[in-house]
């Protein structure tokens, strides 16, 4: 699942930085599957987009996988925004 998420995001968004964190072990009742993920996506594709539009871009890239994931947390930053927090 993690590799599929990475592949879909990389094919649809020009990612300068991409982290996918499987947070499933922190949530009971979901053992053995990737059910909760945190995505940190850094891309200039987000430049000029508000938070909702950024998340829509991420969800569109994952549209064929969303039904298999219980919860997705998204951090979406432009390269300049990311430089300001790292």
Q: Where would I find each of the regions flagged by the language model?
A:
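N-proximal, solvent-exposed amphipathic alpha-helical segments enriched in charged/polar residues
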Residues: 1-21
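C-terminal structural segments of small proteins and small subunits
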Residues: 57-86
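Secondary-structure boundary/capping motif
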Residues: 31, 49-50, 78
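Short amphipathic alpha-helices in soluble, non-transmembrane regions
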Residues: 9, 52-58
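Short, flexible active-site-adjacent loop segments at beta-strand->alpha-helix junctions, enriched
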Residues: 24, 45, 78-80
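Short edge beta-strands and adjacent turn/loop segments
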Residues: 16-37
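Solvent-exposed beta-strand sheet faces enriched in polar/charged residues
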Residues: 21, 40-42, 73-77
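A short interface-forming secondary-structure element
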Residues: 38-51
């Amino acid at each position: 699942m993690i590799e599929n998420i990475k592949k879909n995001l990389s094919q649809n968004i020009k990612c300068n930085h991409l982290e996918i964190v499987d947070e499933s072990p922190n949530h009971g009742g979901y053992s053995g599957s990737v059910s909760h993920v945190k995505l940190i996506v850094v891309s200039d594709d987000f430049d000029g987009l508000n938070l909702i539009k950024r998340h829509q871009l991420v969800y569109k890239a994952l549209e064929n996988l969303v039904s298999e994931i219980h919860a997705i947390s998204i951090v979406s930053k432009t390269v300049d925004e990311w430089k300001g927090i790292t």
